[in-house]
Amino acid sequence: MEEFRVPDKIAPEIGWRVWLVVAHTPDRLALHSAVQAKVEWPMRQALRAECRRLVAHESAGVVAVGGPAHAAPDELCGHGGGHGCGIYATKSAEDCADYLKGFYSPTQVRGAAVVHRILGKVALWGRVIEAERGWRAEYGYPAEIWIPPTLHVASGREIGTTRAPTLPLGRIADLLGGYGVPVRLLAGDAEPLAA
């Protein structure tokens, strides 16, 4: 039986994060973690964090080997140079964009095409660990999805290149509407930073 814990607060933290948009079929897009690309964010249900110590930074092709997994997030996980488990979000769109600029972007996840990378707001709850620029949480779900026309990405060895989505933006917005949260099409890359 799992031990009952009284939550620290009732309202979720609202942060910013980046997702990959993956086309599993022509009519089904899903959000995936930009760092743990194989982690799909399910529609209409919360994502629960797991300690993935053995597959840290899989989208960049780096595998970190560690001890046994534990409940996530954990205060001690990540100390001494580890990955620090949990669902990540930054406190501001600016910090999220800074985090994104030099990050590798895969073109496929498990054989499905990555059609875009997007920013958005995410609700975090359960056990939440605060850091200087954001949080790591036990549970998360998109609160708003922001679709820019392009995102500056690192692809292969080229850092700072611009990639256009491989599907029309309106189609991406329609298919991501299944998450049941506001989906915003943006006119320019900087627009999410003004909100």
Regions found by a protein language model. Give the residues of each.
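ADP-ribose/NAD+-binding catalytic cleft of ART/PARP-like enzymes
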Residues: M1-H83, K101-V114, G126-V128, P149-G156
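A short, charged, amphipathic alpha-helix used as a generic interaction element across diverse proteins
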Residues: A93-P106, P168-L175
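A short, structural micro-pattern
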Residues: V114-H116, Y139
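Short His-Asn-centered micro-motif
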Residues: T90-K91, G120-W125
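Conserved inter-motif catalytic segment of the P-loop NTP-binding fold
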Residues: G120, E130-W135
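Intrinsic-disorder-associated interaction segments
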Residues: E40, A89, G111, T162-P165, ...
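A short, exposed loop/beta-hairpin motif centered on an aromatic-Gly-Thr core
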Residues: H83-K91
